Amino acid sequence: LDDAASDGVKEQWYAFRNDRHGDKDLHQLPSSWKSSIYLLDPANKEWQAYIAERNDEVYSSFDFDGYQIDQLGSRGDLYDYSGSKLNLPRGYASFIDAMKQRHPQKRLVMNAVGSYGASQIAGSGKVDFCYNELWGDEADFSHLHSVIKANDNYSSHSLRTVFAAYM
């Protein structure tokens, strides 16, 4: 959110479109919404601790059985605050591991949008199933079949696949 700093989110946690931390990556939303969605570095340990604390608050107030982590698919080249290139799929695995360590009894899943990061997500060994959100260029049965086979391979034949379906 535009005002995330007021809640304790640090500038150093964001994902940036250049190596000079001058342009935060974001998903632009209409001006009628509270804010656009800003992306953070999923491998940043301070961000992981911060969001895990927010999950603590949610779990203490609501009887949720788990957490669905979301992403936006491939974002092109992104950088951390110090100018190092991010490896988002590797960051996803780190984030998943941190969330599972914090709440080992809770279920966990992460959306592999367009199968981006699916290998690292399924290969983390910490999600309950493979979850894929496919788009228009992946609308054929052959695409679904390919994703199921790939996910089966990524998870060493241990996880089933669920697809997001929008009507």
Where are the predicted features?
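Active-site-adjacent "subsite" loops/lids of carbohydrate-active enzymes
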Residues: 1-62
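Glycan-recognition surfaces
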Residues: 8, 13-29, 102-167
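Active-site neighborhood of glycoside hydrolase catalytic domains
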Residues: 43-129, 135-145
